[in-house]
Amino acid sequence: MEKVYVAGAIPEVGLKLLQEHFEVEMYEGKGLVDKDTLIKGVKNATALISLLSTNVDKDVIDAGKDLKIIANYGAGFNNIDIEYAREKSIDVTNTPKASTNATADLTIGLVLAVARRIVEGDQLSRTTGFDGWAPLFFRGREVSGKTIGIIGLGEIGSAVARRARAFDMDVLYTGPNRKEEKEREIGAKYVDLDTLLKNADFITINAAYNPKMHHLIDTEQFKMMKSTAYLINASRGPIVHEQALVQALKDNEIEGAALDVYEFEPDITDDLKSLNNVVLTPHIGNATFEARDMMSKIVANAAISAVQGEKPQFVVN
């Protein structure tokens, strides 16, 4: 029986599928698997189930001399050297569609949380309390009827747009390619990035990360935004220059931000933690029972297909 190495605990539904076809070795330590353990684990393995937090570099790929597939448990795959994997004839797959609804739900949740100051209100209610309802007390911003600007109208961005339309929001989007069919379906308008930044009340980042996207949102971009704008990032941390965001929040160049991802993840800078006008969540975009179970099935089936000589779903290289 061929061996699969699983770089961290995954839901039981996928693990059971793997156990029917492989000898399964899984990292069960606390925290992230370290490089030495990962290199040892992939030796003699024909499949690797990696997590978004698993750094699969050339050293790891070279150690996995028998690898046929690296099935990444997540929609992103910037944790893997996919070009080198291609050179070694190793398929790399991801789990794109499984994350769509969960991440779109969270994106809209972050919009509401930061605009209506829900987290601040919860903290106040649990600590000092409040003196009762008052006309000027704890005002936030309404979402309905505002303009949302979506950076990246892929599967997740489109799902965010549909949810935004339910709030009667106008939808702007930007990306490398115009998507006219999606425009008609959703009622979205394609604009360039600068136009989006200048006109949107809520700016959501739902694009995949690649080196060209690094610090897409920096000091210059924050200066373009409305002083009442909010930035929401549920994609990848390095798309936003985090220190520039901190400065924009401190200088009231924008009204607030909500982040599920961070530039130096898992570290969150103390400056961000100290600000009241930012909502922080611990990279939980697709952290639902439904999405994580589906992702578990997808990576298991991809590994099974690869060792059976079939082309797996969702190959990214």
From Swiss-Prot:
The keyword Membrane is annotated on this UniProt entry: no
Domain of life assignment: Bacteria
Keywords, comma-separated and alphabetical: NAD, Oxidoreductase
Primary enzyme class: oxidoreductase
Single Gene Ontology MF annotation: oxidoreductase activity, acting on the CH-OH group of donors, NAD or NADP as acceptor
Protein family per UniProt: Belongs to the D-isomer specific 2-hydroxyacid dehydrogenase family.
Name of this chain's protein: Putative 2-hydroxyacid dehydrogenase SAOUHSC_02577
EC number: 1.1.1.-
Entry annotated with the keyword NADP: no
Binding annotation for NAD(+): 155-156, 234-236, 260, 283-286
Residue stretches in coiled coil: none
Active-site residue numbers: 236, 265, 283
